[in-house]
Amino acid sequence: MEKVPEYHIKNLKITPLYDQSSVMIQLEDAAGRKDIDYDVTVTARTMWPLKTAGRTGRPCMVRIPHMRNWSPEDPFLYDVHIKMGNDSVESYFAMRKIEVKNDKNGIPRIFLNNKPYFQKGVLDQGYWPDGLYTPPCDEAMIYDIQKMKDLGFNMIRKHIKIEPQRWYYHCDRIGMLVWQDMVNGGREYKSWYVTWLATAMEGTHIRAKDTRLHLMGRQDPTGQKQFESEMKETIRRLYNHPSVVTWVIFNEGWGQFKTRKMTDIALAEDHTRLIDSASGWFDQGCGDIKSIHDYFFPLNITPEKRVTALTEFGGYSLQIPKHSMYEKDIYGYKIFKRKKISAERMKN
């Protein structure tokens, strides 16, 4: 709960315009009033403060001289202070650009700041041993992100979960790219179709349609509307975080429906990021990425106009004594008993 003036700032939207060395600021006041004046101050340790003025209902453009990029190697952030009447907010932004372009050989690649950038990431389901989905403290979130970076990863795919915004802040300042999943929802799906048959078909390149809603657990129109609403809310909530570079709409057919329509809706909300429309199995040919999940078969890739990404693989497990909550049960797509063999397989 926060005490605010009668007329106060409701929403702040910040969009970096990388190729223009500028940032666009859009401010919304709680009463929906247009043409209300506000002041903007942009600061950074490498420059003198930049001051300008804007009005609600109109984009406010701020040019950034001697612009410094944001990347995992150099996660540079600019601070911004905005004052409207008796209300003020502080935030930050970064100058970075994510897109798909062809490289010099005509192969579609993900570009970060106008250069091809290989993303090597982990799937993070956000579980904690004591709080389940609730992190115990700020330091625990920092530790996870920093440890992944120390191990050589530059991306985390946040899987079927929205974290507290503090987590995304740490990704912003530490320098960790984020692929953000939408929370799936829907009713219970048919495992024989969504899991077993889909896995068997993955290597055939036969495109299964997303119209069998009763098999995917998404036959309820109310649930479809709820998903659309929550997808929009997720994008709006996380829009200002520079670390977030990809929206993942559906995962492995769980509650999947109207994939092309949902992709168009997500693009209307945010055209500055990439979209992985269907991560694994039920690809509908839309979005920026052909997203492959391959746990069991030799990798078989066909040329695509989109980026081809191996977005799930591995799942190897080696139980370490006294480091498991359940000593008897262990999950993995391949279970190892000896550390040496496991290390060799991971290397290869």
Predicted regions and their residues:
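Secreted/periplasmic carbohydrate-active enzymes, especially glycoside hydrolases
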Residues: 1-170, 174-178, 245-246, 265-268
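Substrate-binding/catalytic cleft of secreted carbohydrate-active enzymes
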Residues: 145, 155-348
